[in-house]
């Protein structure tokens, strides 16, 4: 049942080409206004709906497809396990993705969803492929505090945006600290969170205002996919009766093995009431932020306390956030109901005094299964261009290869409507090149085929092992499908095939 995402671009009209909208997103005139950027994204989904949507809109199709992607991040040569040590003796496990060079790049902190840890995360694999493999960013993927690994490795336990938001600030400080060797590879820091991990992204966007140095933002941008906005009501919706709640309860028991050793009251619980009792016990025994220290500045009038629910309802303090916060939310969402969460921001039911917060509402998808009902290439382009637009110090350089097509075989073939379709062939384990199979079509519908070989040494990764692993082979295909541009180039009455791709400068 598993499948390997390739991220293949499909031919779209010029008006709906992801490349066109990506360049618009990176326009410096828009980067200063999140409302304009958000309006542009919403407009893209509305005006290009027929080309962006794949037709895979079924509820179970979306869930099954997101859960069955074939990917082995734990054995990926470019990903390594790390442990981040935080105040309060908190240990946070992560996967660090580095391109293998010494270039300063934007680094994206990815916060996983409920119960997810770096040894076992499924739907979030798509975002790791998009942000690390297909984009010019380095990535630090961090477990959710509700994961079994976090329970096993820490004496205290909690969950939610208050604690994870503080963690995000502390991790961003580490990544920006000149004493830390990793900081030498960091151009700017960005945070990207999913579901319950999105709640911490939202709180850290508020904390960022009070914890950034005078010379610039600590964190440059925030992205939240189907985030929890109202933690208490979302938890009630997950645990209050029905088949869904019974399934979630069984799932939580399986994923939180060992929690009863940290919360003795969980030794006994009523049928299908494990999660609700766990949540109640966490709130009852909460003593304040697990990693809260006085150097983390909270908003005025907000104090660290033992009131779990009050601390996680931080919206009354949410004023004039300075860095952009872009939320993607799907109307269909059984896990984080849209009407209880992102819709509160969109409809202004939450009185938020900030122009740097914007919701993109999407009609297709189930709990942000965006790469299933929408074009993978386009989604990646939107994520990539948003982060790039808020990384002003990061520059890219375009690599170009021209192939002369003036010989007899191509005589009279080309016209103003000529275009190129391509398919990337997976390179062999010992190859230093990758083959691109192309079909060139002119305006009359005639087609010709040709192949092109490109050297791996010219891409945005440094391949140091004598043989490519399966993960690297698949990554190369995805990277080229996202970044390779091919076109027929007229020059002095002749024609050439021009291949271009961009890499970090």
Which residues does each PLM region occupy?
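Alpha/beta-hydrolase fold nucleophile elbow
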Residues: 183-195
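Alpha/beta-hydrolase-fold enzymes
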Residues: 194, 200-293
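Glycine-rich "HGGG/HGxG" loop immediately N-terminal to the catalytic nucleophile
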Residues: 146-158
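Short, surface-exposed "cap/lid" segments of acyl-processing enzymes
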Residues: 99-136, 140-145
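Short beta-to-alpha linker loops that shape the active-site pocket of alpha/beta-hydrolase fold enzymes
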Residues: 143-148, 228, 365
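Alpha/beta-hydrolase active-site loop
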Residues: 158-181
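N-terminal cap/lid segment of alpha/beta-hydrolase-fold proteins
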Residues: 52-100
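Serine-hydrolase catalytic core
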Residues: 247-366, 374-383
């Amino acid at each position: 049942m598993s499948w390997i995402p390739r991220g293949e671009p499909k031919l779209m009209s010029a008006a709906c080409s992801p490349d066109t909208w990506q360049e618009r997103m990176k326009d410096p005139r828009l980067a200063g206004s999140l409302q304009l950027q958000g309006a542009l994204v919403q407009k893209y989904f509305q005006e290009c709906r027929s080309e962006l949507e794949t037709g895979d809109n079924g509820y179970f199709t979306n869930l099954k497809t997101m859960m069955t992607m074939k990917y082995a991040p734990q054995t990926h040569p470019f990903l390594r396990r790390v442990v981040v040590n935080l105040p309060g003796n908190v240990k946070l496990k992560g996967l660090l993705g580095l391109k293998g060079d010494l270039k300063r790049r934007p680094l994206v902190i990815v916060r996983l969803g409920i119960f997810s840890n770096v040894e076992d995360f499924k739907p979030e694999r798509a975002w790791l492929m998009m942000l690390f493999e297909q984009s010019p960013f380095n990535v630090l993927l961090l477990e959710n505090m509700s994961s079994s690994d976090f329970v096993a490795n820490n004496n205290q336990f909690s969950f939610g945006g208050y604690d994870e938001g503080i963690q995000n600030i502390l991790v961003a400080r580490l990544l920006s600290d000149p004493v830390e060797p990793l900081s030498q590879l960091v151009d700017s820091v960005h945070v990207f969170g999913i579901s319950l991990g999105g709640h911490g992204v939202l709180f850290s966007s508020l904390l960022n205002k009070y914890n950034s140095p005078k010379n610039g933002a600590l964190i440059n941008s925030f992205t939240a996919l189907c985030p929890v906005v109202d933690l208490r009501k979302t938890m009630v919706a997950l645990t209050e009766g029905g088949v869904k709640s019974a399934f979630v309860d069984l799932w939580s028991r399986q994923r939180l093995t060992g929690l009863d050793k940290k919360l003795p009251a969980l030794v006994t619980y009523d049928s299908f009431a494990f999660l609700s009792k766990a949540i109640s016990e966490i709130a009852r025994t909460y003593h304040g932020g697990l990693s809260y220290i006085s150097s983390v500045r909270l908003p005025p009038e907000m104090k660290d306390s033992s009131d779990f629910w009050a601390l996680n309802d931080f919206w009354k303090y949410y004023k004039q956030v300075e860095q952009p916060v872009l939320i993607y939310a799907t109307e269909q969402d059984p896990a984080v109901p849209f009407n209880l969460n992102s819709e509160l921001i969109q409809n202004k039911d939450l009185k938020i005094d900030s122009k740097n917060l914007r919701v993109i509402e999407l009609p297709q998808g189930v709990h942000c299964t965006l790469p299933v009902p929408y074009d993978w290439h386009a989604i990646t382009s939107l994520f990539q261009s948003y982060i790039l637009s808020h990384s002003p110090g990061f520059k890219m350089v375009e690599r170009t290869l021209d192939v002369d097509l003036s010989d007899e075989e191509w005589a009279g073939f080309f016209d103003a409507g000529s275009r190129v379709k391509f398919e990337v062939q997976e390179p062999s384990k010992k190859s230093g090149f990758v083959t691109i199979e192309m079909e060139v079509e002119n305006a009359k519908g005639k087609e010709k085929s040709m192949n092109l070989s490109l050297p791996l040494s010219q891409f945005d990764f440094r391949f140091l092992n004598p043989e490519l692993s399966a993960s690297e082979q698949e990554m190369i295909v995805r990277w080229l499908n996202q970044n390779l541009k091919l076109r027929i180039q007229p020059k002095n009455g002749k024609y050439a095939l021009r291949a271009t791709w961009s890499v970090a400068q």
